[in-house]
């Protein structure tokens, strides 16, 4: 089977590389000729553990190709994945212009039966929108099926998530398209991955609902953490106490500076927008969004209480990406926190193991260190924002001795409060 993936960003590249690893013949297409040129030279446009190796392996094997030639890719493919961006508009709804453009390309070059699959996160009704657009613009009488096959990839663990998914959601009313999709995912039968076969609309809503629910857990535990700060108890004890309940589960009950990235902020706002379009209030989702917005200010207040007046102070920030094992700076909590610090007159020196190049684009006016110890030298305070594993193994005695003032705001609760205080640090965590 030959498939085409239109869009070679995070979702498209991981999807293409993983299907190629399954043995499928894959062509990844992108209108960005510089991105395609870099991919042809083995240079990844994103950081994702294991992806560079997977791309190189399957490119060398001849199963994975990159091109800007949409026509050739569409004409050769039986299944065409649309994995283009859906950035938010000012009202929170997704911009579908890239999806429309990709669907128009499929219509223009359709030369036989095709399965057109939305891999991008799209609002309810997009599948039918694509069907109508292709029907209006196709130049042949060829039939086609439309499928919603949302991705549930975690940045930093995307390859494992694709290869060993919790479930595969396939939404369509076309039985032939469903059969082809099942065949495409046949390698997953060996690990008995469950399949959810449903309507286009239910599949589209499933993606939004899943991310909104996970975001709800994050905002909930952050509210509990803020309450723990006032009460004087440890949020981790509370999280363990509720997380052991099988109805709740322990995942996503980790307090911190709030959620960021390409999914949770965008998808919660999009779900709220969709609800309004259908005349429905989304009270819980709206509250989740507000709690997350407020959390950045809560973290800044925590730093201010620790440090005092920030004018002229040097603050070291460790961790910039929205989570470990990625260079993704989209809506990263570090952005708002650092902007608060600099607006208050502090100077910021930051370090992140992989996100510097992306961080410079959104935070061009701060200093960037070569390593953790370079960042903390002469600092009036250290702020942990992203919980990279290497930050858990720092020589904290050396860190203390390098700092001007041994004050730590640990926004990811990487270290134990008592241990830090015994070492001579003035330490604050989140909900501890």
Segments from the language model and where they lie:
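Structural/interface elements that position substrates and couple domains in central-metabolism enzymes
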Residues: 1-432
